[in-house]
Amino acid sequence: MNTGWIESTRGDFYFYHQGMSPSVAKVSEKLDEERLAIGRAYGFDLLSITGYMNQNYRAQYRNYRDFAQGSPIHNKTKGAPQSMKHRYLLEDIGHCIVPWYELGLKAGLSSPTIKAIIDLASIVSDFDYLSHRRALKAAGLSEASKEEISLVLGGTIEDDPRVLAPLSDNYANINGLETGPPVKATQVAA
């Protein structure tokens, strides 16, 4: 949604304060509504993006635009991508938005805003994200039903939604599987 800003300024703008215009925020919130609907289809009552930001930053933002304009930490530095090959596009679309879309399709949801974002990202990055989608396949779930996927995700097929809180620095127990502490990145000499 900020392709013009990114290409014209090479990232020399405040990604949230300047890039999150009223229309961009509206699209972001619509995408989030579709994400929440997908979560509900699998038995989860997920936090909205604004709710998540309020919870994690102990704030009271009314909506995503309010957050983008008012968050001191997100507006401290410009921090915008310098090109359309940035991880915000490549990773967020391929590893986040496309899996949501795949899960939505399994649940019978068309998710038109999510699909539009994927299509636009494919055009500007010269990479067809949908033809390379592999999230469900990589998880061994490409042939699974919505109900089977729901059980794997720890959701329910009954009307029993639950809120997913963000993971803390403590060990997490996800679906009965113990996970260790977060992996720390290390620098490897060339």
Placement of each model-derived feature along the sequence:
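Phenylalanine-focused residue identity feature
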Residues: F13-F15, F44, F67, F127
